[in-house]
């Protein structure tokens, strides 16, 4: 039906006869000559309809509406110099049409304009309700093309590194120690349920036991969890696993993979190896295990300096085993008012969202003098003040913000304020496409964290991460040493966002059982839930490890978008709904009966 794509035509095609198909982006009538901007997925080109080419052709063109689907034949010619459009790649040429056929008409009114000439914002709800129209817009076309380029580059790289692409099951079993599963009832096995995979974790480990050695998959994953801008109930992972590789070898190969993607998509040569931070160092310096290193304001622990000054908020936190930490805002005296820091202010509100009950602050004046509340100023001696200013690197005109309490809350508070103030003070362009790509690895995570609600340890990543061998010690000390051991786990962070992560895996069945016992799974339950894995580990499992990247998030960053919904063809809302198909939806009583399910939910009419 067509000989060329609209956006691929150039001056070299002048005098060529072409057949084009696409949508009418807009139509203009100028003094008896009709101009049509014809659009397909590659771009737009100007079509000229001259009445000299025939009255029937002209009549059809006169009645065209935007988004009508057409086929046009004609000859490419140069535009007059005064009418060239340098903003378009096809702006130096046009097609003089000699044939126009309407392939499909528009019925009714469009819910929003799709034209490349219309930049008026459209509500996301409307875009998602009519996603098939939104996909025609240049923004979405570019994002999906970019997504394709990322996948193509990743596949090519992994093929060259001798990886096999292997699919793992979508219908699997529900296992503990993860997010909430999406469950699927079995009609054949009455009363039993499948779960949709949260990741291919156990299957890719079994592939390593099976001797595949190097595996990858563009994996669909499902998690029934509360959503935000960078989360979806179903999402895509670039999933990788390999045998007989050390942690450093895995990180090195991953850096080459990421570098190949950035080079292909952005033309950027990334410098690697990427910096490494231990988990503890990241928490100490940034208050988070996903640090953004494009700006300063690093956390400083000033507990030792301030523990004896007589300010109950500080001393009480320290005496209770917590800490006092702070961040320094360069030039903050001029940039931030007291009103913003006190109750009711936006900075105070951000701190409250992280769990803080209050904020303290010091303004640094000339000659090392400070302004602060009396309870701090009156009890801070000269030596303490000098040491505080030295440790915080604070100078005249700077503002120091303090948080006190349990260390976890203090870290969350200052990490949140650090990110909020970086955006508020425009320390970095927050459109995320500023070409500043600060990659880093966070390594040496704790194996476990304490779940106070359930009064037990739980795996910080998952219970299949291998512990650091130097922390583990001899076999008889495993149960004693495991709770405080570090995991051989690693996360890749870019500009404050986690791109993905992984670990070396446990390949010793006894150690795996001990880890499951540590998180509170009795022997019989462990064998019931993970017996297939434990049995496989007894059959000569090789040392192995891997990682997974969130494809949607990578594309979001590369595209300069603020939500992964703009990188997915048919995303869900933050309520996990598809506005286009109105899923999820009720099913018939007959379907429920076949599945042996009775609903107890009473729907409000």
Swiss-Prot record:
Family assignment from sequence similarity: Belongs to the class-II aminoacyl-tRNA synthetase family. Type 1 subfamily.
InterPro entries: Aa-tRNA-synt_II, aa-tRNA-synth_II, aa-tRNA-synth_II/BPL/LPL, Asp-tRNA-ligase_1, Asp-tRNA-ligase_1_N, Asp/Asn-tRNA-synth_IIb, AspRS_core, GAD-like_sf
EC number, UniProt record: 6.1.1.23
Protein name: Aspartate--tRNA(Asp/Asn) ligase
Keyword S-adenosyl-L-methionine: no
Keywords of this entry: Aminoacyl-tRNA synthetase, ATP-binding, Cytoplasm, Ligase, Nucleotide-binding, Protein biosynthesis
Binding site for L-aspartate: 177, 223, 461, 505
Catalytically driven reaction(s): tRNA(Asx) + L-aspartate + ATP = L-aspartyl-tRNA(Asx) + AMP + diphosphate
One annotated GO biological process: aspartyl-tRNA aminoacylation
Localisation: Cytoplasm
Protein role: Aspartyl-tRNA synthetase with relaxed tRNA specificity since it is able to aspartylate not only its cognate tRNA(Asp) but also tRNA(Asn). Reaction proceeds in two steps: L-aspartate is first activated by ATP to form Asp-AMP and then transferred to the acceptor end of tRNA(Asp/Asn).
Marked site: Important for tRNA non-discrimination: 30
Residues given in the record as ATP binding sites: 223-225, 232, 498, 550-553
The organism's place on the tree of life at top rank: Bacteria
Quaternary organization: Homodimer.
Annotated region described as Aspartate, given as residue ranges: 201-204
UniProt GO MF annotations: aspartate-tRNA ligase activity; aspartate-tRNA(Asn) ligase activity; ATP binding; nucleic acid binding
GO CC field: cytoplasm
């Amino acid at each position: 039906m067509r000989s060329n794509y609209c956006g691929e035509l150039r001056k070299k095609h002048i005098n060529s006869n072409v057949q084009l198909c696409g949508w009418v982006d807009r139509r203009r009538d100028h003094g008896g000559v009709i101009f049509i901007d014809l659009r397909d997925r590659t771009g737009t080109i100007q079509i000229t309809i001259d009445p000299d080419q025939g009255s029937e052709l002209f009549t059809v063109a006169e009645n065209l509406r935007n988004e009508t689907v057409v086929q046009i034949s004609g000859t490419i010619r140069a535009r007059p110099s005064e009418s060239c459009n340098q903003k378009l790649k096809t702006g130096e040429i046009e097609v003089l049409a000699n044939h126009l056929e309407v392939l499909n008409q528009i019925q009714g009114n469009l819910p929003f304009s799709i034209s490349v000439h219309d930049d008026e914002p459209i509500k996301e709800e409307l875009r998602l309700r009519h996603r098939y129209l939104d996909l025609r817009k240049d923004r979405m076309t570019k994002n999906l093309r970019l997504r394709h380029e990322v996948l193509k580059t990743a596949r090519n790289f992994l093929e060259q590194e001798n990886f096999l692409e292997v699919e793992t099951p979508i219908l699997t079993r529900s296992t503990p120690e993860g997010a909430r599963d999406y469950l699927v009832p079995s009609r054949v096995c009455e009363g039993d349920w499948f779960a949709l995979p949260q990741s291919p974790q156990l299957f890719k480990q079994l592939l390593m036991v099976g001797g595949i050695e190097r595996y990858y998959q563009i994996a669909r994953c499902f998690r029934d969890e509360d959503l935000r801008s960078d989360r979806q109930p179903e999402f895509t992972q670039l999933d990788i696993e390999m045998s007989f590789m050390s942690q450093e070898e895995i990180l090195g190969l991953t850096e080459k993979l990421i570098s190949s993607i950035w080079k292909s998509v952005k033309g950027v040569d990334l410098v690697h190896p990427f910096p490494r931070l231990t988990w503890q160092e990241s928490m100490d310096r940034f208050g988070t295990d996903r640090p953004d290193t494009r700006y300063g304001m690093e956390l400083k622990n000033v507990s030792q300096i301030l523990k004896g000054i007589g300010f109950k908020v500080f001393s009480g936190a320290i005496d209770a085993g917590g800490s006092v930490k702070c961040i320094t805002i360069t030039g903050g005296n001029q940039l931030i008012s007291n009103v913003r820091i006190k109750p009711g202010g936006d900075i105070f509100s951000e701190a409250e969202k992280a769990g803080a009950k209050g904020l303290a602050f010091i303004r640094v004046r000339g000659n090392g003098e400070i302004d602060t509340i009396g309870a701090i100023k009156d009890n801070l001696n000269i030596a303490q003040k000098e040491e505080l200013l030295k440790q915080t690197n604070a100078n005249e005109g700077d503002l120091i913000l303090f948080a006190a309490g349990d260390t976890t809350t203090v870290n969350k508070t200052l990490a949140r304020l650090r990110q909020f103030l970086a955006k508020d003070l425009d320390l970095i362009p927050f459109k995320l496409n500023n070409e500043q790509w600060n990659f880093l690895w966070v390594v040496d995570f704790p194996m476990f964290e304490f779940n106070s609600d359930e009064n037990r340890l739980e795996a910080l990543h998952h219970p299949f991460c291998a512990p650091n061998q130097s922390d583990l010690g001899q076999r008889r000390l495993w149960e004693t040493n495991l709770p405080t051991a570090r995991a051989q786990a690693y996360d890749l962070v870019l500009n404050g966002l986690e791109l993905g992560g992984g670990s070396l895996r446990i390949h010793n069945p006894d150690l795996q059982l001990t880890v499951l016992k540590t998180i509170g799974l009795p022997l019989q339950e462990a064998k019931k839930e993970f017996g297939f894995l434990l049995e496989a580990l007894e059959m000569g499992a090789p040392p192995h490890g891997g990682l997974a990247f969130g494809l949607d998030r990578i594309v979001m960053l590369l595209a300069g978008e603020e939500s992964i919904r703009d990188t997915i063809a048919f995303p869900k809302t933050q309520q996990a709904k598809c506005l286009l198909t109105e899923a999820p939806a009720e099913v018939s009583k007959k379907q429920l009966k076949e599945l042996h399910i009775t609903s107890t939910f009473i729907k409000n009419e």
